[in-house]
Amino acid sequence: GFNQVDKRWLKNYNELWNFPSELLEILQYFTGEKSPKIKNPKDKRRMFLTEFTKEEQEQVINFFIKNQALIVNDILKGRGQFASEWFLVILKIEKQDLKWLLKPINEVINFYSGEVLITDRGSLKIGKITMQRKGGDNGRISANMLQFKINPCELFTEIIKRD
């Protein structure tokens, strides 16, 4: 299943990636930091990327294409003295042997990187990474955080394909 690999407030991502002001505003509507600017949004708390104009959608896509290497590295590896060099996945399925794999982080970064697109559900895909509003949290403000998710089990299918 899917696992959250990074979750922060938009202002913290802005400190890392320096969003252009127009993009920052789009992402504020996306996370719900700002109330929707359109009539009859799918969700009264926020806007989905599919609800923005084509030009606004292109701004989002172009920024994440241009900065994909930096963004994926920050999300999966991190920065500074605690940056990860390895990626461990443990798979426990009922009534089956435990499986695990340990991969160099750069292989994992390459595996999860790829085409940047807006999904039909209004989130962003950066390769195999999903960017979405955190949501949940019973209406608490922390639902407005931005999160990135992956399915770590996909690394097991990559090994099977090569064998």
Model-derived regions, located:
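Short, positively charged
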Residues: F2-D163
